[in-house]
């Protein structure tokens, strides 16, 4: 059976915005669900309009085993703080490591936003 990992990290950063995007902005983002860990990612994102929801639907329809990672979204604002960036990427990397420990992966689907900027 094909096995893929699914996760994401989305933010539209505006370098001219006066307020940086902090960790709490991903915990309580408004509009989209808050930060999701592997255990809640699939059930929470399935009914949304997030791109991951489409990837989940197709993977499940095709009989692909999904290894959920972590998923984060914050509303548009200033650059993502170093703390938030490092914490979220660490969650994704740790979940990916756990998924690989559980068995081989055939692919990784990461929902990313091309306009994200971090402080560093």
Which residue ranges define each predicted feature?
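Low-complexity, highly charged intrinsically disordered N-terminal segments
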Residues: 52, 56-96
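Active-site histidine-anchored catalytic micro-motif
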Residues: 5-12, 18, 78-120
């Amino acid at each position: 059976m094909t096995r893929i990992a699914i996760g994401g990290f989305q933010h539209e950063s505006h370098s001219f915005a006066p307020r940086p995007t902090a960790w709490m902005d991903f915990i309580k983002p408004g509009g989209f669900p808050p930060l999701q860990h592997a255990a809640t990612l699939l059930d929470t994102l399935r009914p949304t309009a997030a791109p991951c929801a489409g990837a989940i639907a197709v993977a499940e329809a095709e009989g692909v085993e999904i290894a959920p990672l972590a998923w984060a979204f914050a509303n548009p604002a200033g650059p993502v703080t170093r703390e938030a960036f490092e914490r979220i990427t660490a969650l994704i990397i740790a979940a990916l490591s756990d998924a690989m420990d559980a068995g081989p992966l055939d692919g990784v689907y990461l929902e990313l936003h091309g306009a994200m900027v971090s402080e560093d």
